[in-house]
Amino acid sequence: MKTVLVDWNLIPYAEAWQRQTEWFDTLVRAKAQGEAYENRIIMCEHPHVYTLGRSGKENNMLLNDDQLKAIQATLFHIDRGGDITYHGPGQLVCYPILNLEEFHLGLKEYVHLLEEAVIRVCASYGIEAGRLEKATGVWLEGSTPRARKICAIGVRSSHYVTMHGLALNVNTDLRYFSYIHPCGFIDKGVTSLRQELKHEVPMDEVKQRLECELGRLLNEKKQQIAQ
């Protein structure tokens, strides 16, 4: 089946969640009934919003409702894995809705693939990024006291169909992370491409690079199956 790229640009979180849920349900149903379907890779940005995953702890949000309103942010409890994270303008969010069985991927391998795609995007800007043991996502200097996260990852999978995905800080206002314990960590920082490069990075350029790396990695999986 084919995989198509969809760009929603700036979209409210609630609308994006509803639309990806509908597409997710459609793919699950089509797969179960043996019907044709499309894999989709959605890219977008959101207005200021915090999302708390199934395993998240309420005390990792440091603001009350009135304080959230004051910074023009909202909070959603959602059905992905992971703890609390922030989405906002200048952050590239990617929601792949994929049939993992088509690529012979398990959930752990899939998360590893998402991390690898972001690591390669960072490398294309001269930034050395990697993984941190027992901590999903992409990190800089992960094994040092200066460890800082540049990309959060949280997914949901049912019948080997995925939704939710990754959030890569490009030109993100990092002050919004100070209102939470990002992903439940209290001793690690966050960063962005702009923070590391000391200049704005064109969002369309980053989208193109991420699309390229995801496509390359998924195609490699398909080629391995064919061999």
From Swiss-Prot:
Q: Which reaction does it catalyse?
A: octanoyl-[ACP] + L-lysyl-[protein] = N(6)-octanoyl-L-lysyl-[protein] + holo-[ACP] + H(+)
The EC class name is transferase
Q: Where can this protein be found?
A: Cytoplasm
Intrachain S-S bonds:
none
- Superkingdom field: Bacteria
**Which residues does UniProt mark as catalytic?**
C183
Its primary localisation, in coarse terms, equals cytoplasm
Q: Which InterPro entries does the UniProt entry name for this protein?
A: aa-tRNA-synth_II/BPL/LPL, BPL_LPL_catalytic, Octanoyltransferase, Octanoyltransferase_CS
Q: In which pathway does it act?
A: Protein modification; protein lipoylation via endogenous pathway; protein N(6)-(lipoyl)lysine from octanoyl-[acyl-carrier-protein]: step 1/2
Q: Which residues bind substrate?
A: R80, G81, G82, D83, I84, T85, Y86, H87, A152, I153, G154, G165, L166, A167
Q: What is its EC number?
A: 2.3.1.181
> Which terms under GO biological process does the entry name?
protein modification process
Q: Which UniProt keywords apply?
A: Acyltransferase, Cytoplasm, Transferase
Please report the stretch or stretches of sequence annotated as the BPL/LPL catalytic domain: 35-222
GO terms for cellular component = cytoplasm
- Positions of the record's site feature: Lowers pKa of active site Cys: K149
The protein's matches in PANTHER family, at most eight in alphabetical order, are given as: OCTANOYLTRANSFERASE
What miscellaneous comment appears in this entry?
In the reaction, the free carboxyl group of octanoic acid is attached via an amide linkage to the epsilon-amino group of a specific lysine residue of lipoyl domains of lipoate-dependent enzymes.
Q: Which HAMAP family match?
A: LipB
Similarity section? Belongs to the LipB family.
Reported function: Catalyzes the transfer of endogenously produced octanoic acid from octanoyl-acyl-carrier-protein onto the lipoyl domains of lipoate-dependent enzymes. Lipoyl-ACP can also act as a substrate although octanoyl-ACP is likely to be the physiological substrate.
Q: What is this protein called?
A: Octanoyltransferase
Q: Which gene encodes it?
A: lipB
